[in-house]
């Protein structure tokens, strides 16, 4: 908190004479919504018991105009959080959201962290440079020739200290294995033997440590005494050269830290400005249909009041015009205009969801976020809602982001599908490509869970269970979201990419 406050005054100084961020290239490319490095974290608790949940971590994707984009994953993977972050129901932690080329939401956590870690890395590097400078000067001033010997002793000391740590780890592992011996007497003897062997190894290394430390102390004393002698003019000139060389490197590092801080403070100021000066009329063109039709409708309000609430927020209070809009939108979603005077509890689940759709459509949106709108409905009603959304998409030219946990639902409805797992997109491709050539193990797991309407094949079907520890080895190289073929992205490292390329060739 103190770190953020330290540069607040600088942010305020750069706050004036700004305009909202606009990226015309997104409009030229026909991109309705662009998400870049979206992160949504939630903090819980206080003090030592505080922890952070990374609900969405570094998610990026584009949705083109008129497209239906599917976001699929199991419960808790961050689908709904992503949708709510896009429509500003949450203040996003980091990243940017662009709607029709304009930045509608952004977070500054990454920028603040960049300043912090640049300073930490910079200070660490400056300390290293000063240490190297002192080492070179010591070598120049040393008349005893013992500086290289001191360096060798220091290296051996660090190796012995690491060996001591390794011995203790090995002893612990061997004792854990010996604990499985059934015979108590044999187990006790084995543990005593392990402890004795480890103690002997530790003692031998401690003796060597004492010898080296004594020798190191002696050498350092001799070097210290030799430094008291005045250096020759030639040596003094070399020392000045070393000081100048490292002084220029240290200055360059300090300049780099200042430059990064200046750039990130400027970026933070722009983010704060964009978040404060969001175009409300533009945001009204982005609407959301919620998952639960019961909880999303206020039971104390009539259907008319529920639908026209958004109009009132936008300052549209003309009763006649609003009533006409409500009748039109109720007709669009397949409900009678007379239902406007009723309350939500008087309707079935499917009808309530249609009211939720009507509430979103009355604002005449261009982008619609559908957060699992059919998961709480009967199977027969689901098809009706899907068909309704499809008709509205064609009639009104809507761009839709459809959130679901079942791949079979979005197979024929969505143009492209992104698969999410624990806050990250693990695979993104067109609907046909994803079902024809699934690559990521988690996608295979979701596809294997889809039941088939064939009793014979259903009996033979084997369910694939995704276990990250078994399916991936990221100990040496972390994964990245890579475009393996045009339009098909997968989260993988270089080893997995080679394997996936072989799969695609077959």
Each model region followed by its residue ranges:
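Conserved ABC ATPase "signature" region
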Residues: 321-338, 447
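A short, surface-exposed alpha-helical micro-motif characterized by mixed small hydrophobic
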Residues: 410-412
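Short catalytic/signature loops enriched in Gly
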Residues: 1-33, 43-47, 52, 109, ...
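Conserved ABC ATPase signature
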Residues: 343-347, 351
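Hydrophobic anchor residue at the start of the ABC signature
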Residues: 357, 385
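Conserved catalytic motifs of ABC-family nucleotide-binding domains
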Residues: 364
């Amino acid at each position: 908190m103190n770190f953020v406050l330290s540069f607040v005054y600088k942010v305020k100084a750069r706050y004036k004479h700004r305009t909202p961020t606009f990226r015309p290239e997104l409009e030229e490319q026909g991109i309705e919504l662009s998400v870049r490095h979206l992160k949504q974290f939630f903090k819980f608790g206080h003090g030592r018991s505080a922890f952070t949940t990374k609900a969405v971590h570094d998610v990026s994707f584009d949705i083109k105009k008129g497209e239906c984009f599917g976001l699929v994953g199991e419960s808790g993977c961050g689908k709904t959080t992503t949708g709510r972050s896009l429509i500003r129901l949450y203040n996003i932690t980091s990243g940017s959201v662009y709607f029709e080329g304009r930045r509608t939401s952004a977070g500054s956590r990454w920028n603040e962290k960049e300043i912090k870690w640049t300073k930490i890395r910079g200070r660490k590097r400056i300390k290293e440079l000063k240490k190297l400078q002192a080492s070179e000067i010591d070598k120049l001033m040393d008349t005893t020739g013992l500086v290289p010997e001191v360096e060798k002793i220091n290296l051996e000391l660090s190796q012995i200290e690491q060996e001591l740590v390794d011995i203790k780890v090995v002893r612990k592992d061997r004792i854990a294995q010996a604990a499985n011996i059934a015979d108590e007497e044999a187990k006790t003897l084995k543990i005593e033997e392990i402890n004795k062997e480890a103690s002997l190894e530790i003692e031998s290394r401690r003796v060597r440590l004492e010898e080296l430390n004594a020798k190191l102390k002696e050498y350092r004393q001799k070097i210290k005494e030799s430094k008291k002698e005045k250096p020759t003019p030639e040596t003094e000139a070399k020392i000045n050269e070393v000081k100048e060389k490292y002084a220029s490197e240290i200055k360059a590092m300090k300049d780099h830290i200042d430059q990064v801080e200046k750039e990130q403070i400027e970026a933070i100021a722009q983010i704060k400005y964009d978040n404060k000066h969001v175009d409300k009329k533009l945001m009204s063109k982005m609407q959301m249909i919620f998952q639960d039709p019961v909880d999303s409708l206020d039971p104390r309000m009539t259907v008319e009041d529920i639908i026209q609430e958004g109009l009132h927020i936008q300052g549209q209070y003309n009763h006649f015009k609003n009533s006409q809009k409500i009748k039109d939108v109720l007709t669009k979603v397949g409900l009678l205009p007379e239902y406007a005077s009723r309350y939500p509890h008087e309707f079935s689940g499917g009808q309530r969801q249609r009211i939720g759709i009507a509430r979103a459509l009355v604002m005449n949106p261009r982008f619609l976020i559908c957060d699992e709108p059919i998961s709480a409905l009967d199977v027969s009603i689901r098809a009706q809602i899907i068909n309704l959304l499809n008709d509205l998409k064609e009639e009104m030219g809507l761009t839709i982001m459809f959130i679901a946990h079942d791949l079979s639902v979005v197979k024929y409805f969505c143009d492209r599908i992104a698969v999410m797992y624990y806050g990250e997109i693990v695979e993104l491709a067109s609907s046909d490509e994803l079902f024809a050539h699934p690559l990521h193990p988690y996608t295979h797991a979701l596809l294997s869970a889809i039941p088939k309407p064939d009793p014979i094949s259903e009996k033979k079907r084997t369910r694939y269970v995704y276990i990250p520890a078994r399916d991936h080895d990221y100990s040496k190289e972390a994964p990245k979201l890579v475009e393996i073929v045009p339009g098909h992205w997968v989260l993988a490292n270089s080893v997995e990419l080679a394997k996936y390329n072989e799969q695609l060739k077959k």
